């Protein structure tokens, strides 16, 4: 089953000084599953990388995506409608996180690779009781 990555996990992977860096890096090295990133996560992660780590890190991220090392998952119209439902239900959830949830629900994924324990732990997906938050 594929692993869906959110912004925090991608950022932690890029920033060796991030508190989550070693955990995310080691977890992803050990996994042999397809890595997926929602298309909505890309600009958010790229922005944070450029702002905090510099243009070279953002460029490496773009090169990684272009090389296909991480697959990109697009939103469907149903996903966008589900995002609206999630935003209506959870006032703490932003659009990018809602898109992560919507894609995970559509793909029937049970786990998310994320550093955001606070928000994703509070969401109740439609296909399971709760997401397993990795690493």
Question: What spans do the regions from the language model cover?
Answer:
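Acidic, PIN/NYN-like endoribonuclease modules and their adjacent C-terminal/linker elements
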Residues: 1, 101, 105-135
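Short, well-structured N-terminal submotif of metal-dependent ribonuclease cores
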Residues: 1-37, 50-63, 126-127
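Histidine- and aromatic-rich ligand-binding microenvironments
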Residues: 3-6, 37-39, 93-95, 116, ...
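Alpha-helix/helix-capping structural signal
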Residues: 8-9, 40, 78, 118
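Short acidic, glycine/proline-enriched helix-loop-strand junctions
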Residues: 62-65, 69-76, 81, 89-90, ...
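Active-site neighborhoods of divalent-metal-dependent phosphate/nucleic-acid chemistry enzymes
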Residues: 70-115
């Amino acid at each position: 089953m594929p692993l869906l990555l959110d912004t925090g996990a991608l950022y932690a992977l890029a920033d060796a000084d991030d508190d989550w860096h070693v955990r995310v890096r080691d977890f992803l090295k050990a996994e042999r599953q397809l890595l997926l990133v929602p298309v909505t996560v890309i600009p958010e992660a790229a922005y944070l990388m450029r702002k905090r780590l510099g243009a070279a890190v953002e460029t490496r991220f773009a090169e990684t995506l272009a090389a296909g090392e991480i697959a990109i998952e697009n939103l469907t119209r149903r996903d966008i409608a589900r995002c609206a439902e999630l935003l209506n239900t959870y006032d703490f959830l932003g659009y990018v996180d809602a898109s992560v949830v919507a894609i995970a629900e559509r793909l029937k994924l049970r786990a998310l690779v994320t550093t955001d324990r606070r928000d994703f732990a509070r969401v109740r997906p439609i296909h399971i009781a709760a997401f397993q938050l990795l690493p």
